[in-house]
Swiss-Prot record:
Zn(2+) binds at C52, C55, C101, C104. Belongs to the MsrB Met sulfoxide reductase family. Keywords: Metal-binding, Oxidoreductase, Zinc. This is Peptide methionine sulfoxide reductase MsrB. Binds 1 zinc ion per subunit. The zinc ion is important for the structural integrity of the protein. InterPro entries: Met_Sox_Rdtase_MsrB, Met_Sox_Rdtase_MsrB_dom, Mss4-like_sf. It catalyses: L-methionyl-[protein] + [thioredoxin]-disulfide + H2O = L-methionyl-(R)-S-oxide-[protein] + [thioredoxin]-dithiol.
Length: 142
């Protein structure tokens, strides 16, 4: 096996192309964004946990989800585990903070400083980047 990190990463990306649908790959691995109001998890209201679609790292508890009216699932707080990583995004002539899964590097969405109390944060997350695991043991993939 190669010890060249770049080569190992490209092999991993090949694997993601097999594991994910074309749209999931675009959102999760190429930092794309799904169209607003199209995500399966936007209207999910049950109690449970939102996890990373790619590695199942726990991301957001359902009790921090709120309707921001923006067209994507929104949360005001990540789990205390800290599986969300932050990077500056200056694409499209804007300055934003992009969020990724800290465990596998999967793109999640963006965080904005216009959310509700108690944090004032709005984690705006693509449904395609998450799986919902309900307390009723029903799983919904975004």
């Amino acid at each position: 096996m190669s010890t060249d990190k770049k080569q190992d990463e490209s092999i991993a990306e090949k694997d993601w192309k097999v594991e994910l649908s074309e749209q999931e790959y675009y959102v999760c691995r190429e930092a794309g964004t799904e169209r607003p109001f199209t995500g399966v998890l936007l209207d999910e209201q049950r109690d449970g946990l939102y996890v990373c679609k790619c590695c199942e790292a726990p991301l957001f508890p359902s009790d921090t989800k709120f309707d921001a009216g923006c067209g994507w699932p929104s949360f005001y707080k990540q789990l205390d585990d800290g599986n969300v990583d932050y990077r500056e995004d200056v694409s499209h002539g804007m300055r934003r903070v992009e969020i990724f899964c800290k465990q596998c590097g999967s793109h999640l969405g963006h965080v904005f400083p216009d959310g509700p109390a108690p944090t004032g944060q709005r984690y705006c997350v693509n449904s395609l980047s998450m799986t919902f695991k309900g307390e009723d043991n029903v799983e919904v993939k975004g």
